[in-house]
Design a protein with these regions (language model features):
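Conserved RecA-like P-loop NTPase helicase motor core
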Residues: 589-600, 651-762
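Conserved pre-motif I regulatory segment
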Residues: 182-224
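Mg2+/Mn2+-dependent nuclease catalytic core
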Residues: 66-163
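A substrate-engagement module of RecA-like helicase motors
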Residues: 187-188, 194, 247-357, 365, ...
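Metal-dependent nuclease catalytic cores that hydrolyze phosphodiester bonds in DNA/RNA
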Residues: 1-87
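Walker A/P-loop
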Residues: 216-238
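A contiguous, basic/glycine-rich beta-loop/short-helix subdomain that forms a polymer-engagement track
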Residues: 332-357, 368-374, 477-592, 600-604, ...
């Protein structure tokens, strides 16, 4: 007797199903997409409150889950209906609310088939659960600029609703079969997958074990893993094993820079090379500007053939790319050209079918551009956060916003002569900036003025935000009427986005923020500054099952657990896998590089660096806390040490200039080279100069951020909230830069090199306690002759 075939079981969000099958038309980013989730949620709540007054039994955000069978597939469909109520004639109504910036004239009953489909599925689930013979489906559209409400209704029997859902499932069935077959093969392969190297590196097995446990059990892990452990493989391999065993995922590998995305891609490539039949899909999400196929990026159907008719062609393109296990930027561009679809959107759409998604922090943490398709609700996601020491700073930026007086004044000038509601609205905003400039000048006159003309407010400016809200309608109307991309359109469109960004931050403004007003000449700059992003980060991490935050520098763990929003995380710190004797570690203890001592320090700094370089011919880097200090030291060093080739980091270097700088660090140099750079800059982390391409670094000072009004606000805030203002605002961020800079030397077990710390503060307990265990052999030096002897001894050993 033949064994019965077990049904294929698949769970799908209703919205994902209907948008995939029924969305039509083109990509048009003129106004769609910007903060739609937040703005839509606000409008939803407003309309739901109004509906409750009209219908006493109106229930908002009703969670629905229904099981539907189609052939051998059992679908579980789930989602939240915006509203369900009983109409005056006794018929139950499902209300689906949508916000749109499209002109009201375009909003017809046939405006968006996917909206009807979504409401129909909800109605079918509700009718089946409550044994109703009929239901009504209502679409409620809110046109955001005119604040106009339009409603459309359709009546269905329970049988008709069931047939509509079955038609959707019949269309989706081939995709469901493919997804389930892939997942089954993937899990089997991952369970059998072996570690791709003959042996683990020192510390690597311990790290992988910690990562596996947190992925299996759920929770948060903070892992300090020094250079050489192989961090990318140490997190990806156990996360993938957990995916195979627990059937969780997808895995999000989140990075601060493109170079670390490459490290993740390389680790996956090694796994695929070791297991050629491995079923594993990955996609690398690349910024729109970098992956766009057009010379000028304008995402409208009129300007871009890849945007025009995108939704008619995307399913064919997706079916094709599902055969490709590794979707990089280049691969996405290739398939996008083949199918005439946008490569950026193709990457986003393919992410729903991927096992590993590699991308920037902002795809999870940025409230504007995070992946709504995943993060509207909680999932079994695994978040791997590389270079996590960068996360608090990046998160502060994501939750801050700034506007300048000039942008409003110039916009008004570009509009030319004559009166209009838009020019009037711009004038009113400009007037507030003028008032702020007067206040900044008055307050500065009453203080010492060492930080310039600036002042802070602990609360948002309700008046200013109200004027910006009033500005949006005429500004949006002007943009609707003037779509040619000339200078005026470009400036006003950017202003529109900047205003919307400001208002989004204003909606979250609380005691974690300050408002800073700064005047300089006729310019005035207003900035809403997020001082503490930990609550926002905690909310983001709560969307997933597990999170691993890892970096070579996460000390002290308590600080990073706090600011990264993972106070309950398990923290582990692994020892360096390299022999301690390969690194000469010295501290020049007879000099202060504090700001007030900078001029006096230059001679000893120069002597120390020159002694380091002369001890052995090779390539070296010297890191300074600021450009100004670096320029001073560079000029003096070149004058006094002409036999040593010197280069320096320039401000705002492009990729070509950075590459040219690093290209001078050649293996086996015949003449010494000393590069001058800034701590925390482009050469202070993420630079991998192996072997003898770099044999020493000099680090001038403990890297404390420059004292300024913002940094002092951070200090005051963390003193009040944590009792550790100086540590949080200055000492911890500074020492992280020091440790990152020191990590540029000794990149492999065979490397040998010197780290020279130049400042007497490095000897103090408050700084020593932040140094890693493998720095226990730090030797204090108090004169040049002693340094010469110690360097000679180190290189001779």
């Amino acid at each position: 007797m033949q064994e019965p075939v077990s049904p294929i079981q698949i769970t799908l969000p209703v919205r994902q199903l209907v948008e995939f099958l029924r969305r039509a038309g083109s990509i048009d980013n003129r106004f769609t997409g910007f903060d739609r989730a937040n703005e839509g949620a606000r409008i939803h709540r407003k309309l739901q409150r109004a509906a409750v007054k009209e219908h006493a039994d109106y229930a908002a955000e009703v969670f629905l889950r229904g099981i539907f069978a189609y052939e051998e597939i059992e679908f579980t469909l789930e989602g939240r209906a915006d509203g369900i109520f009983t109409a005056a004639d006794g018929v139950t109504v499902v209300d689906e609310i949508k916000t749109t910036a499209c002109p009201a004239a375009d909003i017809t009953p046939d405006f968006a088939p996917e909206h009807w489909a979504q409401a129909i599925v909800y109605a079918a689930i509700y009718a089946a659960q409550h044994e109703l013979e009929e239901m009504r489906v209502q679409l409620t559209y809110f046109q955001v600029d005119e604040e106009l409400i339009l409603r459309f209704e359709r009546h269905y029997t329970a049988q008709q609703l069931q047939e509509e859902v079955e038609a959707l499932l019949a269309e989706y069935a081939p995709w469901a079969r493919r997804a389930v077959e892939w997942k089954k093969a993937r899990n089997s392969d991952l369970q059998a997958m072996q570690f791709p190297f003959p042996a683990y590196r020192p510390g690597q097995r311990a790290m992988a074990g910690e990562v596996y446990k947190v992925c299996r059990d759920g929770g948060r892990l903070l892992c300090q893993a020094p250079t050489g452990i192989g961090k990318s493989m140490s997190v990806l391999f156990p996360a993938l094993k957990s995916m195979g065993n627990e059937s969780v995922g997808p895995i999000f590998y989140l990075t601060a820079r493109g170079t670390t995305r490459t490290a993740a891609e390389n680790a996956l490539a090694i796994l695929r090379d070791t297991e050629p039949e491995l079923h594993l899909r990955s996609v690398t999400l690349t910024a729109k500007d970098k992956i766009c196929l057009c010379e000028t990026r304008e995402c409208t159907p009129e300007a871009c053939p890849y945007a025009n008719g995108y939704y008619a062609r995307i399913k064919g393109a997706l079916w094709d790319v599902l055969d490709v296990p590794c979707l990089t930027a280049e691969t996405l561009q290739e398939y996008a050209e083949r199918h005439t679809v946008c490569p950026f959107e193709l990457g986003l759409d393919s992410s729903l079918w991927s096992d590993v998604i590699i991308g920037d922090y902002n795809y999870l943490f940025d409230p504007v551009v995070h992946l709504v398709r995943f993060f509207e609700s909680v999932g079994d996601y695994i978040f791997l956060v590389d270079e996590a020491h960068n996360l608090p700073g990046r998160a502060r930026e994501m939750h801050s916003a700034a506007l300048t007086k000039t942008s409003f004044y110039e916009a008004k000038k570009l509009l030319g002569k004559g009166k209009s509601s838009l020019k009037n609205a711009l004038t009113k905003v400009n007037d507030v900036f003028i008032e702020w400039r007067h206040r900044a000048e008055e307050e500065t006159a009453a203080r010492d003025g060492r930080f310039g003309k600036t002042f802070f407010l602990k609360e948002r400016s309700e008046e200013f935000d109200h004027l910006l809200n009033r500005l949006c309608e005429p500004l949006k109307a002007w943009l609707d009427d003037h779509r040619e991309p000339d200078e005026t359109h470009t400036a006003l469109l950017q202003l529109y986005f900047d205003v919307r960004a400001w208002l989004r931050v204003a909606d979250t403004f609380d005691d974690h923020f300050v408002l800073q007003i700064t005047a300089s000449g006729s310019e005035v700059r207003a900035a809403q500054l997020c001082l503490d992003p930990s609550a926002f980060l905690a909310d983001s991490f709560a969307l997933g099952r597990a999170a691993v935050l890892f970096s070579a520098t996460l000390a002290p763990a308590s600080y990073y657990k706090d600011l990264c929003g993972v106070p309950e995380a398990r923290a582990v710190a692994l020892r360096s896998p390299f022999p301690a004797g390969n690194q000469g570690l010295f501290c020049i203890g007879n000099v202060s590089t504090r700001y007030k001592d900078r001029d006096a320090s230059l001679a000893i700094v120069e002597e120390s660096l020159a002694t380091m370089v002369r001890a052995r011919c090779g390539n070296y880097l010297a890191f300074f806390p600021s450009y100004a200090y670096m320029e001073q030291a560079y000029a003096q060093f070149k004058e006094h040490c002409p036999e040593i080739n010197c280069i320096k980091q320039e401000n705002a270097m492009d990729e070509q200039q950075k590459a040219a700088f690093l290209a001078q660090f050649v293996p086996g140099p015949r003449h010494p080279l000393l590069g001058f750079a800034v701590m925390g800059g482009v050469f202070g982390e993420g630079v991998d100069l192996t072997g003898d391409r770099l044999i020493g670094v000099g680090i001038v000072g403990p890297g404390l951020p420059q004292v300024g009004p913002r940094q002092e606000q951070l200090r005051d805030y963390f003193e009040q909230t944590r009792g550790s203002g100086f540590d949080y605002a200055y000492r911890y961020p500074g020492m992280n830069k020091v440790l990152q800079a020191a990590g540029r030397v000794i990149r492999t077990p065979r490397d040998k090199g010197v780290v020279l710390l130049i400042d007497n503060r490095f000897a103090m307990p408050d700084y020593r306690r932040l140094m890693p265990p493998h720095w226990s052999h730090l030797k204090m030096i108090y004169d040049t002759e002693e340094l010469e002897r110690e360097l000679w001894r180190f290189w001779e050993e």
